[in-house]
UniProtKB/Swiss-Prot annotation:
Protein name, UniProt field: Guanine nucleotide-binding protein G(q) subunit alpha
Species this protein is from: Homo sapiens (Human)
Residue numbers spanned by region G4 motif: 270-277
Family: Belongs to the G-alpha family. G(q) subfamily.
One Pfam family named in its UniProt record: G-alpha
PANTHER family: GTP-BINDING PROTEIN ALPHA SUBUNIT, GUANINE NUCLEOTIDE-BINDING PROTEIN G(Q) SUBUNIT ALPHA
């Protein structure tokens, strides 16, 4: 065998090895691409206090590790702070709305609670417990609570204030429902990934207040689905940032902007009409037609009201080929969210079967 033929033979062995390595790299790249495609990015959008953070907490309960006692203990201080924040908001509103206290001694209680620096609150003890209990039982404060649409008050106010004995117990440990109800405005971006049927769902919650929205822009790449939350109960409320703008009009304007963004041409849109429980309560005394004169349905009818609100949002969609999937929800109700998200998951997977190699 000549030297040339020996070298050619060696070279072809090297070439074969190089090709084998190259093929393996190509295969790995294809695998990586396929695996990357098995991650679905769900962007949670909506105005402030529409229920986005509560929805993420539910995903942790339903599809994640939930909340251990240690995790729940971490919310104790926030529950106390929510109680003080709510009572201070009502005390301020008593002045603004010129509502008198029925019981004279509650003026001193109000002064005591008013002077608390909420951010420094880490305990819930007397004299504050008795002061807040006494205030909550004052008919003046109850009238003020009934007029809450005229100022900003957390949806969880009644939930906590009706349960002060339990929360004031020295051995208090927040329940799962306490955790779901606690209000902490989202600043920045919160991501929650969870695994379902060998697909990673990456849920991204961005702050809803106006100042937070400019931070959204870089979340817009490769979004599988937009999940847009609307608080049904906000039809008669004004914005935190601007007290002459209707919250639902703001939500409609944001939805219109989002669904016409070029980034989202290929993203499915799922509309969650949230806080259906609060709508059912409120519609009995606050009439939709007073805020949306075009409503011509019956008064005190939650079903008619929510269908009207759904139509208002769906009509904002300029693309007749784009389907808007919608669900009525109560984000603090784990079973409701479990049921709704199972349907949403199936919709998303169906829409992405080929794209994500799920068939």
């Amino acid at each position: 065998m000549t030297l040339e033929s020996i070298m050619a033979c060696c070279l072809s062995e090297e070439a074969k090895e190089a090709r084998r390595i190259n093929d393996e790299i190509e295969r790995q790249l294809r695998r990586d691409k396929r695996d990357a495609r098995r991650e679905l990015k769900l962007l949670l959008l909506g105005t402030g206090e529409s229920g986005k953070s509560t929805f993420i907490k539910q995903m942790r309960i339903i599809h994640g590790s939930g909340y251990s006692d240690e995790d729940k203990r971490g919310f104790t201080k926030l529950v106390y702070q929510n109680i003080f924040t709510a009572m201070q908001a009502m005390i301020r509103a008593m002045d603004t709305l010129k509502i008198p206290y029925k019981y004279e001694h509650n003026k001193a209680h109000a002064q005591l609670v008013r002077e608390v620096d909420v951010e420094k609150v880490s305990a819930f003890e007397n004299p504050y417990v008795d002061a807040i209990k006494s205030l909550w039982n004052d008919p003046g404060i109850q009238e003020c609570y009934d007029r809450r649409r005229e100022y900003q008050l957390s949806d969880s106010t009644k939930y906590y204030l009706n349960d002060l004995d339990r929360v004031a117990d020295p051995a208090y440990l927040p329940t799962q429902q306490d955790v779901l109800r606690v209000r902490v405005p989202t600043t920045g971006i919160i991501e929650y990934p969870f695994d379902l049927q060998s697909v990673i769902f990456r849920m991204v919650d961005v702050g809803g207040q106006r100042s937070e929205r400019r931070k959204w822009i870089h979340c817009f790449e490769n979004v599988t689905s937009i999940m847009f939350l609307v608080a049904l109960s906000e039809y008669d409320q004004v914005l935190v940032e601007s007290d002459n703008e209707n919250r639902m009009e703001e939500s409609k304007a944001l939805f219109r902007t989002i669904i016409t963004y070029p980034w989202f041409q290929n993203s499915s849109v799922i509309l969650f009409l949230n806080k259906k429980d609060l709508l059912e309560e409120k519609i009995m005394y606050s009439h939709l037609v007073d805020y949306f004169p075009e409503y011509d349905g019956p008064q005190r009818d939650a079903q008619a009201a929510r269908e009207f609100i759904l139509k208002m949002f769906v009509d904002l969609n300029p693309d007749s080929d784009k389907i808007i999937y919608s669900h009525f929800t109560c984000a603090t109700d784990t079973e409701n969210i479990r049921f709704v998200f199972a349907a949403v998951k199936d919709t998303i997977l169906q829409l992405n079967l080929k794209e994500y190699n799920l068939v």
